């Protein structure tokens, strides 16, 4: 049997067990969702939260083609806001040509993961983006 590389998510809200998905903190009072940990909801100031899985598909609501970035970051790439059935997710679009001819508002996309890097022990750091559906 082949060894399976250990995998760790690049961000805490990316869940890799089973089918990859994003998990948010949802306010138990008003339903606002946050990917980071909160002490109180920014919408209603309540303090109760539950963890919820986010839909793995959605539509591009806004995007920009980034042509200038920090040293070492390959350009161009597409930064987008994806509406995942009511939850906004900021992420890069991957596996698509970064040009206006290939990206459009309302474009259907789905969550995808990729290896960001591998350490000396073979552990893979896994990132996420959205690709055309």
Question: What are these regions, as identified by a protein language model?
Answer:
Residues 1-22, 127-129, 133:
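A broadly conserved sequence feature marking short terminus-proximal activation segments
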Residues 114-133:
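OB-fold/S1-family single-stranded nucleic acid-binding modules
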Residues 26-29, 40-46:
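Short, cysteine/histidine-rich loop/knuckle motifs that typically chelate Zn2+
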Residues 88-99:
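Beta-strand/loop nucleic-acid-binding surfaces
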Residues 21-24, 38:
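Residues immediately within or flanking Cys/His clusters that coordinate Zn2+
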Residues 35, 48-50:
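Short functional micro-motifs and their immediate structural scaffolds
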Residues 58-60, 93:
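Conserved hydrophobic positions within beta-strands
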Residues 97-110:
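Short nucleic-acid-contacting surface segments enriched for D/E, G, S/T with interspersed K/R
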């Amino acid at each position: 049997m082949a060894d399976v590389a250990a995998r760790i998510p690049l961000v805490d809200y990316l869940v890799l067990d089973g089918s990859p998905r994003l998990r948010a903190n949802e306010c138990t009072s008003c339903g606002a969702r946050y990917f980071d940990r909160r002490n109180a909801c920014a919408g209603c100031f309540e303090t109760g939260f539950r963890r919820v899985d986010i839909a793995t598909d959605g539509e591009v609501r806004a995007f920009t083609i980034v042509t200038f970035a920090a040293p070492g970051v390959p350009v161009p790439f597409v930064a987008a806001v994806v509406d995942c059935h009511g939850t906004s997710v900021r992420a890069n679009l991957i596996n698509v040509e970064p040009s206006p001819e290939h990206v459009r508002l309302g474009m259907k996309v789905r969550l995808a993961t990729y290896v960001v890097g591998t350490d000396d022990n073979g552990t893979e750091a896994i990132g996420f983006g959205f690709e055309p559906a």
